Design a protein with these regions (language model features):
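Short hydrophobic/aromatic-enriched beta-strand-loop microsegments
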Residues: 13-16, 102-105, 166-170, 243-248
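Alpha-helix capping and helix-loop boundary segments enriched in small/acidic/polar residues
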Residues: 29, 36-43, 62, 81, ...
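General structural feature for long, well-ordered alpha-helical segments within catalytic domains
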Residues: 3, 7, 44, 67, ...
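A cross-kingdom feature strongest in bacterial/archaeal respiratory oxidoreductases
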Residues: 5, 14-21, 40, 53-93, ...
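Non-catalytic, well-ordered alpha-helical segments in soluble enzyme domains
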Residues: 278-306
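Long, well-ordered, tryptophan-enriched scaffold segments
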Residues: 44-143, 147-149, 159, 163, ...
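Acidic catalytic cores of enzymes that act on phosphate-bearing nucleotides/polynucleotides
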Residues: 140-201, 206-207, 362
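Anionic-ligand anchoring segments at beta-strand to alpha-helix junctions in alpha/beta enzyme folds, i.e.
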Residues: 2-40, 155-183
Length: 380
């Protein structure tokens, strides 16, 4: 992001649009409403005594972060061992590990979630929800609720945790997911209006992964210059006017700030095998011109990292891989959330004889690794 800011200083009309093939739009929109920030909350299940999950596969790809370690710590046998209630429509890894798994249609899951919220706030509830409400009240701050699906479900789960004063909520923010559907739609409007002169696609392929990929392909055709930074000959590669082979991540330098207080560096394990370059190297070349000493991305990375790692030396940070407690800031706190609107939306889902649940298979992801034979051996 620092590099793109420098790039934008050179080219003021440049815009950065983040695209996720598997978006967490509902979760991010809910976080924006409840916490006032578009970042996912970080939870810690260590020491918790009750977790109630509504469609949330929190041992899978839920919330953009992993809870397996703290879940395992809380599940050690003992008087305060974590009790796990899973309410879901399809079988998940998380549901398979639950003490009590309640199988319901999606519309029914929504209604139980609303009733649990109402019950915790003094409202009347059904017999099924009453038992969950009672357990949550007994455990209080040692309980936590997760939900997945719509924005409304996430909002109610956050507000339930606020009501419980759940200790699982750390106040830390997870920055790994950034896709903004509104921003993406704005970008599509720019292309449709002929306002995009150059499009640089950094190893993304919306033509394949987006539900309206064919429409995206037609819009791309309106852009005079399309550059695909790609690792394979995919649909975006075919639509581009120019292609830059991107370096494999095992050949690349980089840094990340995955969550509050954590800064991490990545370094290549091998020299580049082919004539390729990572997007950061390309941005430096486009900023400074060819054969410029300032195009060395390692030097750029080192200079920027030094400002983020506090008193740690760059070599020490590189050796450890992770620097905790650095200058990566951003904390979350409860600042809002419209429970009435969320409840109305969830109750509006009409029950029917057949209801559809769509989910992302963790092992397949967005399908970009479908040419890996191992991924063709999965039972489903």
């Amino acid at each position: 992001k620092k590099l793109f800011a420098d790039f934008k200083a050179k080219y003021p009309t440049a815009e950065l649009v983040t695209y996720d093939a598997v978006p967490h739009t509902a979760a991010l929109d809910a976080a924006q409403e409840v916490f006032g920030q578009r970042a996912l909350p970080v939870y810690d299940l260590s020491g918790m005594q009750l977790v109630v999950s509504f469609q949330a596969d929190f041992l899978g790809d839920y919330n953009g972060s992993s809870l397996e370690t703290s879940y395992a710590a809380a599940r050690k046998p003992g008087p305060d061992m974590l009790r796990h209630i899973q309410i879901e429509s399809n079988m998940s890894l998380t549901g398979a590990n639950a003490d009590s798994r309640i199988k319901l249609k999606p519309s029914a899951v929504n209604k139980v979630l609303v009733e649990v919220y109402n019950g915790l706030n003094g409202g009347s509830v059904s017999k099924e929800a009453a038992g969950i409400v009672k357990e949550l009240q007994e455990k209080g701050s040692n309980a936590v609720v997760f939900a997945d699906g719509s924005k409304a479900a996430h909002v109610l789960a956050h507000l339930i945790n606020q009501k419980l004063a759940s200790k699982a909520f750390t106040g830390k923010a997870n920055f790994l997911k950034e896709f903004d559907a509104a921003r993406y739609q704005e970008f599509l409007a720019w292309m449709n209006a002929g306002q995009v002169g150059v499009l640089i696609a950094n190893n993304v392929n919306p033509i394949y992964s987006n539900s309206k990929g064919e429409d995206f392909k037609k819009l791309v055709a309106k852009v005079p210059v399309v550059v695909a930074v790609a690792d394979k000959k995919n649909e975006m590669y075919k639509a581009a006017k120019a292609v830059i082979p991107v370096a494999n991540w095992l050949e690349s330098w980089g840094d990340m700030a995955p969550q509050t207080g954590v800064y991490t560096l990545m370094q290549p394990t091998i020299q580049k095998i082919y004539k390729s370059r990572q997007i950061e190297e390309s941005l430096l070349v486009w900023m400074n011109g060819k054969n410029n000493a300032a195009n060395n991305y390692y030097d750029y990375l080192k200079a920027n990292a030094t400002t983020l790692i506090g008193g740690t030396t760059f070599n020490k940070a590189l050796y450890n891989g992770v620097v905790e407690g650095g200058s990566v800031i951003g904390s979350l706190s409860y600042t809002g959330g419209n429970a009435a609107q969320a409840a109305t939306e969830l109750n509006s889902f009409k029950a029917s004889d057949l209801e559809l649940v769509l989910y992302t298979k963790t092992s397949m992801g967005d399908g970009t690794q479908a040419n890996n034979p191992w991924l063709q051996e999965l039972p489903d």
